[in-house]
């Protein structure tokens, strides 16, 4: 059978995505589950993270968010049996590409998929759901009555954060990156308190947030990237400046950032200290990179798929791509021209 792999380029060279022949071992491991893949989500490969974790291969398997049907289980598997519909995220060191017809995965990375939830929907949204849940529950400890500012609420991750927060009785403010996204966010139900446009050049972020919170600032800020310096490149011009984020935080607030290389100067740290605020880095990969909190991770995955099934989380539908377009599609995803894609098998 065939799978999608990435041949990492030399230093700055573009990575190459190739369809490669692959096979599974004859004997199934005791705790492994053999799954026939129905849909697979594609997200950018983080080469730096793989390097940091010491995972180095000539061919890196691509496509990790999978949904499918159990075909066979190892003799010590207790959670699943053949014909079960399952969903999960392959660990970073998995030898399998999620884009194979059949994969092998440890039972502790899978949860049951509710019957009425489509494989395509869950494969496309599972990672964003995991990020949103980790940011809001694990890091920010959100509770009813809190105020939350989500940057770029129309992104797939931002939308998940908004829906999850509204479900828990949190007052949500968000920013929009274009007039179309602004309209989309204003029409969301349950509705957000305020949509703040940041595409006009001048950002009124601080005065609007202070007005909406009675001058107190928000309890939680979730960003999707930060501008570190005043000069703007085309890529970063819509991102908030780190000083703006610290300014909108209330006393005891939580800032959850996705910015891997965030640099704070002593005055920034002093400002955070004066507010007794905290900063957390959002790296959802720790759930599969370490087995320290496996039970909690499975509980989160289960909660996400149940909320999707119940209609609490309603991800934007992803258009499905046929398998023969996988290499081209993955190249556009890797260049961040497209956030993600779903391949239906």
Cite the ranges covered by each PLM segment:
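Glycine-rich beta-strand-centered segment in the early N-terminal region that forms part
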Residues: 23-42, 50-93
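Residue-level recognition of short, solvent-exposed, well-ordered loop/turn junctions
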Residues: 28-29, 81-82, 143, 216, ...
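Residue-level marker of beta-strand positions
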Residues: 32, 65, 84-86, 102, ...
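NAD(P)H dinucleotide-binding glycine-rich loop of Rossmann-like/cofactor-binding domains
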Residues: 79, 88-152, 184
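Mid-domain Rossmann-like dinucleotide-binding core that forms the NAD(H)/NADP(H) cofactor-binding site
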Residues: 125-203
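Glycine-rich cofactor phosphate-binding loops and adjacent beta1-alpha1 units
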Residues: 188-278
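C-terminal capping/lid region of NAD(P)-dependent oxidoreductase domains
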Residues: 215, 305-306, 310-319, 327-345
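C-terminal substrate-binding/catalytic core of Rossmann-like NAD(P)-dependent dehydrogenases/reductases
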Residues: 267-319
């Amino acid at each position: 059978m065939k799978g999608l792999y990435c041949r990492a380029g030399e230093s700055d060279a573009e990575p190459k995505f190739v369809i490669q022949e692959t096979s599974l071992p004859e004997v199934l491991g005791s705790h492994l589950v053999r799954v026939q893949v129905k849909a697979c989500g594609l997200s950018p490969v983080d080469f730096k993270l793989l390097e940091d974790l010491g995972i180095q291969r000539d061919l890196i398997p691509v496509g990790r968010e999978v949904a499918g049907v159990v075909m066979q289980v190892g003799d010590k598997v207790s959670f699943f049996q053949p014909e079960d519909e399952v969903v999960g995220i392959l660990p970073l060191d998995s030898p399998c590409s999620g884009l194979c017809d059949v994969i092998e995965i440890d039972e502790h990375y899978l949860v049951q998929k509710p019957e009425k939830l489509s494989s395509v929907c869950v494969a496309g949204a599972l990672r964003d759901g995991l990020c949103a849940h980790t940011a809001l529950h694990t890091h920010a400890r959100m509770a009813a009555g809190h105020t939350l500012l989500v940057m770029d609420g129309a992104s797939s991750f931002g939308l998940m954060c908004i829906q999850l927060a509204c479900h828990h009785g949190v007052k949500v403010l968000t920013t929009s990156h274009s007039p179309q996204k602004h309209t989309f966010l204003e029409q969301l139900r349950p509705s957000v308190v305020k949509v703040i446009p940041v595409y006009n050049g001048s950002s009124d972020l601080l005065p609007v947030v202070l007005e909406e919170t009675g001058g107190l600032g928000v309890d939680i800020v979730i960003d999707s990237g930060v501008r570190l310096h005043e000069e703007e490149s085309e890529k970063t011009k819509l991102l908030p400046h780190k000083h703006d984020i610290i300014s909108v935080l209330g006393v005891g607030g939580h800032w959850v950032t996705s910015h891997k290389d965030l640099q704070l100067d002593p005055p920034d740290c002093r400002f955070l200290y004066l507010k007794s605020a905290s900063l957390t880095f959002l790296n959802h990969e720790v759930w599969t990179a370490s087995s320290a909190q496996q039970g909690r991770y499975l509980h989160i995955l289960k909660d996400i798929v149940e909320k999707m099934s119940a209609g609490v989380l309603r991800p934007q539908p992803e258009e499905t791509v046929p398998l023969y377009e996988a290499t081209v599609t993955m190249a556009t995803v890797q260049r961040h021209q497209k956030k993600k894609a779903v391949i239906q098998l």
